[in-house]
Amino acid sequence: MWAAGALKVRDCLAATSVTLRRCLKLGATMAKSKFEYVRDFEADDTCLPHCWVVVRLDGRNFHRFAEKHSFIKPNDSRALHLMTKCAQTVMNELEDIVIAYGQSDEYSFVFKRKSNWFKRRASKFMTHVVSQFASSYVFYWRDYFEDQPLLYPPGFDGRVIVYPSNQTLKDYLSWRQADCHINNLYNTVFWALVQQSGLTPLQAQERLQGTLAADKNEILFSEFNINYNNEPLMYRKGTVLIWQKVEEITTKEVKLPAEMEGKKMAVTRTRTMVVPLHCNIIGDAFWKEHPEILDEDS
């Protein structure tokens, strides 16, 4: 009887094995169907190896978005902090990003030089960053604009740039920070003329046409008693996001001797977190202070 039972089990297993092989063969045949040739039309967008991959996103038609949502001019700290929160979320989700820089309605994300994330496909870098950022913007909106409902979903476009050396990467980030300074100085003077002097936007634009940075600083100081150098660093320098070790102090119950049972103690632990900085990244000082960003092992 035992032998007969074993024979039945063996026959059952053999039949199952045959069925499984047929299913696998059928699956392979279906996967390699006659329609598979359409994959040949996909463009190869692999980023060059051993280069810094940068994804820069910009708000789409954000002038209109800012007007519709009553952004404060020339700078709305709520909007800037929201942008930074979204960028931090992106970095926490995509840990191959070593540094990010943001100003106004744009953010640039720099991936590790040796990152092999999604086989270095540019489309993957761009779509993951932009989609994560856009969804975070909507998700965290109410945390920063409590009294202003989101009237319609914001849009962001993105691009991928590849830089072959540390110097070209530093020059790129310097360019973006220089752009922040130029735009913010202009906007600070422009809105002072509109809001405090009563000029129309067109009149303010004509007043500033052809002026240099020194001229704009003079207008601010002589007419509005504003020293541009005293404006918040976040407005003048933008925001740099880097990974840093941070000590966190939390209070929790710890198992202690009986006489101290039920006591709570402060526990300090070190975590690596995304930290915002408002500093100058043009020149060598920043990079000497944070050499790990350009480490060859990145």
Swiss-Prot record:
User: What is the designated name of this protein?
Assistant: Probable tRNA(His) guanylyltransferase
| One GO BP annotation of this record | tRNA processing
Q: Which family does it belong to?
A: Belongs to the tRNA(His) guanylyltransferase family.
Instruction: Provide the residue positions that the database annotates as binding Mg(2+) 2.
Output: 58, 105
Q: Function, please?
A: Adds a GMP to the 5'-end of tRNA(His) after transcription and RNase P cleavage. This step is essential for proper recognition of the tRNA and for the fidelity of protein synthesis. Also functions as a guanyl-nucleotide exchange factor/GEF for the MFN1 and MFN2 mitofusins thereby regulating mitochondrial fusion. By regulating both mitochondrial dynamics and bioenergetic function, it contributes to cell survival following oxidative stress.
Instruction: Summarize the subunit comment.
Output: Homotetramer. Interacts with MFN1 and MFN2; functions as a guanyl-nucleotide exchange factor/GEF for MFN2 and also probably MFN1.
The reply on keyword Transcription is no
What GO molecular function terms would the record report? GTP binding; magnesium ion binding; tRNA guanylyltransferase activity
Look up keyword Cytoplasm and say if it applies.
Answer: yes
Give the matching Pfam families: Thg1 (PF04446), Thg1C (PF14413)
Q: Which domain of life is it from?
A: Eukaryota
Return the GO cellular component terms, semicolon-separated. mitochondrion
Which Gene3D superfamilies has this protein been placed in?
3.30.70.3000
Q: Where does it localize?
A: Cytoplasm; Mitochondrion
Q: Which cofactor does it need?
A: Mg(2+)
What are the protein's UniProt keywords? Cytoplasm, GTP-binding, Magnesium, Metal-binding, Mitochondrion, Nucleotide-binding, Nucleotidyltransferase, Transferase, tRNA processing
Per the record, what are the reactions this protein catalyses?
a 5'-end ribonucleotide-tRNA(His) + GTP + ATP + H2O = a 5'-end phospho-guanosine-ribonucleotide-tRNA(His) + AMP + 2 diphosphate + H(+)
What lineage is this protein's organism placed in?
Eukaryota, Metazoa, Chordata, Craniata, Vertebrata
Secretion signal, residue range per the UniProt entry: none
- Might you give the EC number(s) for this enzyme? 2.7.7.79
Quick one: which residues bind GTP? 58-63, 104-105
Q: How is the cofactor bound?
A: Binds 2 magnesium ions per subunit.
Instruction: Quote the record's binding site residues for Mg(2+) 1.
Output: 58-59, 105
